[in-house]
Amino acid sequence: MMPLMALGQSNFNLSLIGSFDWPTTEGSDIWGWVNPVDGSEYALVGLNDGFACVNVSNPTNPVQEFYISDINSTWRDVKTWGNFAYITTEADAGLLIVDLTDMTGGTYWHVSNFTHPTNGSSVEFTAAHNLFIDEN
């Protein structure tokens, strides 16, 4: 049993130099974003009970910039487009859109209705397991 455990712990020439713990929740997704103005690097983390933005510019000392509480869900997926983070969940919370230029976490929207692009009708969006953004 011991040789299998040692094999399972291979680090592939990686070293842990910092970490950040959330004592009350678990994560389900992580995505990266770089601030185009100052080059600061951020980990965007989908948590069971919300969304967090962690500054990892100094990887030995990650700092949580903000946290947005949301409906509890095992799955939360994060993607970015420009300076915005888009977060989906299976918890019927719609789409969370966060303006990443506001590091206070105060600029965000929960969206559950969209206007159809061709006929103008309202289209309801409540939940999704995953999110993909076509950059083209």
What are these regions (language model features)?
Residues 8-136:
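Feature marking well-ordered beta-strand scaffolds used for ligand recognition
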